[in-house]
Amino acid sequence: MEAVQNDTALANIEPYFAKNDTNLVMILSDREEYAGEVLRNLILLSRNYPVIVLGSPSWNNFASIDAAYFHQLQLHYFTPYLVDYRNPDVRNFIKRFRNTFGFYPVKTNNRGMHFAMMGYDMACMIIPQAFRYRKSLRECFNPHLKGLQGDFRFYRSSSCAGYTRHSLYLVRYGKDYSVTPVLWE
């Protein structure tokens, strides 16, 4: 069953919830105050109903929302960026960045992109190819690249079009306080 809500209230959503089935709630907002209010209300409802929330990676940057809510509500979100901190290349980059600049590369945008890592990925993947192939880069460009922020899959819609990135990850917060990618083929 679908319950459409607006910005004003969540009071009438409970009748749509099922006690014996998982209730998937999609919150299409990047407004911190709204997302926080909805999540607080869903925490209360989750005491009586199983709830999973599909939200936004921008919520990771919201200071006023308790990160425990993400785990209690099993937050899922899609993101084109996924940093695996167990990856030796990522660990080495962070160590070298810290030694060079005196701080950790933590600045992200509202989609979860690490600016320092994006710059590094672009420098390591694109610039060497641009110097090597110059004007013929388009014909020699490798559309499947691995970077610090995950795999990059680029596709062209036509022979006269540029490349568009099509990599996407689904991230899941677990009740056990894990944060893991959901893998699919």
Regions from the language model: what does each represent?
Residues 103-116, 120-183:
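Segments of small-molecule ligand-sensing domains
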Residues 1-39:
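Extracellular/periplasmic Venus flytrap/periplasmic-binding protein
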Residues 39-117:
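Extracellular/periplasmic periplasmic-binding protein-like sensory domains
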Residues 18-20, 69, 161-164:
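Extracellular/periplasmic catalytic domains that process cell-envelope and extracellular macromolecules
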Residues 6, 31-35, 86-90, 112-123, ...:
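Solvent-exposed, acidic/flexible segments
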